[in-house]
Regions:
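Short beta-strand segments
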Residues: 1-2, 139
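C-terminal substrate-binding/catalytic lobe of Rossmann-fold NAD(P)-dependent oxidoreductases
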Residues: 3-134
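Glycine-rich phosphate/pyrophosphate-binding beta-alpha loops
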Residues: 57-61, 139-146
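Internal hydrophobic alpha-helix adjacent to the cofactor/substrate pocket in enzyme cavities
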Residues: 148-160
Length: 160
């Protein structure tokens, strides 16, 4: 994950048990750990132990991007097939309104306050080794997307 810095990071160089986390967030790209890959295994048990990841905190005030490399179950994969599967999932079914599909050449600030939890960037789909491995990217406004999911949850509870 390439992640915008957050409020728990230092604004000036200071002391921290992790020397990298001690550095000024707005001035540095900071490699660090992430709990996101482990969290996926909690939500999707069949993926437990099959994902790992790292995070680089970057000096942007908001919006992050996930770069995910995976080995497709059907090889060789094509970028068109991968993109179409994501596009279809964004238009119908349980991910409608949560996953968005984008083909415009946008940058991080363009996704600020996007209500979706994930905005798939079809322009960044890359095939490696003739489609034996695929890299995809998806943008997100961490706080705003999460807040919208909490509003969805509150509305669901209110309808019970």
């Amino acid at each position: 994950t390439i992640h915008s810095y957050t409020g728990d990071q230092r604004t000036v160089d200071t002391l921290h048990k992790d020397p990298r986390r001690a550095r000024a967030a707005a001035l540095n790209m900071i490699p660090t750990s992430t709990g996101a890959a482990k969290a996926v295994g909690l939500v999707l048990p069949h993926l437990k132990g099959k994902l790992d990841g790292t995070s680089i905190r970057v000096p942007t005030p908001n919006v992050s991007v996930v770069s995910l490399d995976f080995v497709p179950t059907r090889t060789p994969a094509s970028a068109e097939a991968v993109n179409e599967a994501i596009r279809a999932a964004s238009l119908e079914g349980p991910l409608k309104g949560i996953l968005e599909y984008n083909t415009a050449p946008l940058v991080s600030s363009d996704f600020n306050h996007d209500k979706a939890s994930s905005i798939f960037d079809a322009t960044q789909t890359v095939l490696v080794d003739g489609g034996k491995m695929v890299r995809v990217c998806s943008w997100y406004d961490n706080e705003w997307g999460f807040s919208n999911r909490m509003a969805d949850t509150a509305a669901l509870f209110g309808s019970l």
